[in-house]
Amino acid sequence: MLIIRNKQDLKEAILEQKKANKTIGYVPTMGFLHEGHMTLVSHARKETDFVVMSVFVNPTQFGPNEDFDAYPRDEAHDAKLAEEGGVDILFVPTVEEIYPTELATKLHVIKRASVLDGADREGHFDGVVTVLTKLFHLVNPDNAYFGQKDAQQVAVVSGLVEDYFFPINLRIIATVREADGLAKSSRNVYLTEKERKEAPVIHEALQLGRELIESGETNEAKIVQVMTDKINEQPSHENIAYLALYSYPEFTPVTDWTKGIIIAAAVKYSKARLIDNELINVKRR
């Protein structure tokens, strides 16, 4: 595995693979890798000839009161897992490498970002599409791999790829979970012992919502209340940031219960904000 830190070296390495007619699979991450990330790598390994992973904690997608400085980082750990997983290039740029000067232009997400994380984290998705536009141009992948846990981000990135004609196939991979159902996340390390024991209730609540919808329930308020009551059975969380249903991938109010629906939750613990979701009537690509 080659570790690359600057743009020019990355572009030259990618060009060499392209000249050899190799297909490129790309896994963008913010590091502190876990089994969820490595599942994305496994899919990339099977479906493409050459796998690139980036580890970059992107400052533009963090709000002023969020955990950019405290976000867990461990490059040695990441490099070890990436190499063991079959990554060919690990791109680990500095902030200055990706943002060498103040931006002269700004990307702004218009659709799919006004609710849930878009409402709760102002400017978050603008930062996501900004950094991915840069990284997509640098890596020039055939396939890019994302996890379903970040379903709203996936919908936003799909819009970016469609709007700006990126020749990239987005591959959406099912959320990887702990044995007790908690979605794998780099932020899980922030949980106290009691919080970690209780956090799987998020997934349990979302499954209740799925069961209600699949049994024919269309009273949205009732569905949300049942899920809220379930989460509140475990009192260690500080608050429920959101618990809602929307059409997917549009993120508009549900009007047709036979089409794509997302049930999404964000729950705040003392030092961690955890997200999870269930997709209904949606085929992963």
Swiss-Prot record:
Q: Per its record, what are the GO molecular function terms?
A: ATP binding; pantoate-beta-alanine ligase activity
Q: Where is the active site?
A: 37 (proton donor)
Q: Which of this chain's residues are annotated to bind beta-alanine?
A: 61
An individual GO BP term: pantothenate biosynthetic process
Q: Which cell locations does it reside in? A: Cytoplasm
| Known EC number | 6.3.2.1
Describe which pathway this protein belongs to, using the record's wording: Cofactor biosynthesis; (R)-pantothenate biosynthesis; (R)-pantothenate from (R)-pantoate and beta-alanine: step 1/1
Entries under NCBIfam families matching the protein: cyt_tran_rel (TIGR00125), panC (TIGR00018)
Q: What does this protein do?
A: Catalyzes the condensation of pantoate with beta-alanine in an ATP-dependent reaction via a pantoyl-adenylate intermediate.
* Name listed for the protein in its UniProt record: Pantothenate synthetase
Organism field:
Listeria monocytogenes serotype 4b (strain CLIP80459)
Organism classification: Bacteria, Bacillati, Bacillota, Bacilli, Bacillales
